[in-house]
Swiss-Prot record:
EC annotation from Swiss-Prot or TrEMBL: 5.4.99.12
Organism for this UniProt entry: Methylobacterium radiotolerans (strain ATCC 27329 / DSM 1819 / JCM 2831 / NBRC 15690 / NCIMB 10815 / 0-1)
Keywords recorded for this protein, A-Z: Isomerase, tRNA processing
SUPFAM superfamilies for the chain: Pseudouridine synthase
Reactions mediated catalytically: uridine(38/39/40) in tRNA = pseudouridine(38/39/40) in tRNA
InterPro entries hit by this protein: PsdUridine_synth_cat_dom_sf, PsdUridine_synth_TruA, PsdUridine_synth_TruA_a/b_dom, PsdUridine_synth_TruA_C, TruA/RsuA/RluB/E/F_N
Described function: Formation of pseudouridine at positions 38, 39 and 40 in the anticodon stem and loop of transfer RNAs.
Protein name (record): tRNA pseudouridine synthase A
Family, per entry: Belongs to the tRNA pseudouridine synthase TruA family.
Amino acid sequence: MPRYKLVIEYDGSPFCGWQRQADDPTVQGAIEAAVTRFSGENARLTCAGRTDAGVHAIHQVAHLDLAKDWRTDTVRDALNAHLRPQPVAILSAETVPDSFDARHSAIRRHYRYRILNRRSPAALTRAHVWHVPWPLDADLMHDAAQRLVGRHDFSAFRAAECQANSPIRTLEQLDVARAPMALHDEIVVATAARSFLHHQVRAMVGTLMLAGCRRLAADDVAEILASGDKSRCGPLAPAAGLTFVGVDYDPGK
């Protein structure tokens, strides 16, 4: 039974997240329905990162097993045909060994968060940014962000309904910078870790926003982290600004 690795792009706006639900539209549900229409099989997808409602992806990775040995370009093109007009695209399909698991083989996941930092709201990108109309200092945000990098208990930045067994995570990257001049109204937060807690990225971004408008100092952010107290962190940044941008796998496996 061949295993296929899919690279997927989607606009999360119309979906109630990645994970299949009985009555609500989801990315997984849309792709699995396309698989059934194309192949006649009820295959199940496993993805690298299960995104929440409204969260986007430009390089999500998933795998599925099919009984028939299809050409990979046929898999890609047939799924794209059956997914239309939904905002989901299969960028590539390839066969992989049975040992490959899109979720468990991942060694690093990358997310990007976009903040539109200007007085006027977004006209074209409103479903892909968090509009913050007051001035933010990206350098202050970046300085505060470095207090969160490393292996820590991230209970303060964890959703109440998070089902992870442990709040301990190793944050490998959390960089904040204003975009180049052509997009200078945007502040971009880039982060990477092997895994994240539910709502961790959005909670961190909301807290860094307070550092950017000088309501919190970098030391305050470190204290919030150490306290484990969710009530002390900033607002939960909206889902719209968050995009899953990639996943790394051990090249030797």
